[in-house]
């Protein structure tokens, strides 16, 4: 079993990423943290959209869905909610379906090979998501890849540091896994920039503070508070959106 880390979705365009790999997609601030909180609050399904138009159309097709979105940290016009884990932590989402589109995180999910297994990872569910990835890698006799969502195509410090943290967790649980240079680099970044320092250094963190959304950092920069692991299970035929569920839940088709 091997572990590779990609610091930007664009890296996947230069190779032929194996479809059989297990991909952990990271957007610490905030998409993958938010998805994890959504399932903690009882969500039945989260549908990930690449564009605002796709999300709005998916909301129109199925009344009752909660339309969630973010562009440049703000909630787009016409959306019910933004991309705030702190906001969703106060909501009862039991058996609800949510549509989510964000600047970086949901797009990164689409960047993975179409038929690949994709998990949403973050500091908040670090131990749980790595354990699930290892379980699936053994089950499918495949490797693990960690993909950082980055920020508008640029390197994101918090995603890379979280990749290092998840790599440490994988090595702790699976010490014989073969690692590559990218893993060494990510672990070194995490050791230099743990969450307590990311709070002050990561541009995404500074942007949230500047826009009065610092409450989200209490979720984005906290380790191992959740056992929820959002997982892509397919594509919704009517909308083309990625369907995510928490593996412990059962999705009943309507």
What does each of the following model-derived ranges do?
Residues 10-13, 23-37:
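Short acidic, Gly/Ser-rich segments with clustered Asp/Glu that frequently serve as metal-coordination loops
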Residues 3-4, 21-24, 44-46, 64-67, ...:
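Structural motif
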Residues 47-137, 147:
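Acidic/Gly/His-enriched mid-domain segments of enzyme catalytic cores or analogous surface patches
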Residues 122, 144-151, 174:
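Glycine-rich anion-binding loop/nest that anchors nucleotide
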Residues 149-159:
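Phosphate/ribose-phosphate-bearing ligand recognition and processing surfaces
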Residues 1-11:
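Charged, flexible boundary elements
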């Amino acid at each position: 079993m091997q572990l590779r880390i990609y610091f930007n979705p664009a890296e996947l365009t230069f190779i032929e990423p194996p479809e059989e790999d297990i991909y952990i997609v990271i957007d610490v601030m905030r998409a993958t943290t938010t998805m994890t909180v959504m399932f903690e609050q009882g969500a039945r399904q989260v549908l990930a959209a690449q564009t605002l138009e796709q999300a709005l159309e998916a909301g129109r097709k199925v009344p009752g869905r909660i339309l969630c979105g973010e562009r440049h940290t703000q909630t787009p016009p016409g959306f019910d909610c933004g991309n705030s884990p702190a906001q969703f932590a106060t909501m009862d989402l039991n058996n609800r379906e949510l549509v989510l589109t964000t600047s970086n995180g949901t797009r990164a999910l689409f960047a993975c090979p179409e038929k690949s297994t994709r998990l949403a990872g973050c500091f908040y569910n670090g131990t749980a998501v790595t354990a699930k990835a290892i379980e699936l890698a053994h089950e499918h006799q495949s490797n693990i890849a960690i993909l950082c969502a980055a920020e508008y195509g640029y390197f994101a410090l918090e995603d890379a540091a979280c990749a290092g943290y998840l790599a440490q967790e994988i090595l702790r649980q699976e010490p014989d896994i073969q690692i590559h240079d990218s893993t060494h680099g990510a672990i070194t970044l995490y050791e230099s920039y743990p969450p307590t320092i990311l709070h002050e250094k990561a541009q995404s963190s500074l942007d949230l503070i500047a826009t009065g959304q610092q409450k989200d950092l209490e979720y984005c920069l906290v380790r191992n508070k959740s056992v929820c692991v959002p997982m892509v299970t397919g594509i919704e035929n009517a909308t083309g959106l990625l369907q995510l569920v928490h593996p412990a839940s059962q999705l009943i088709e309507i």
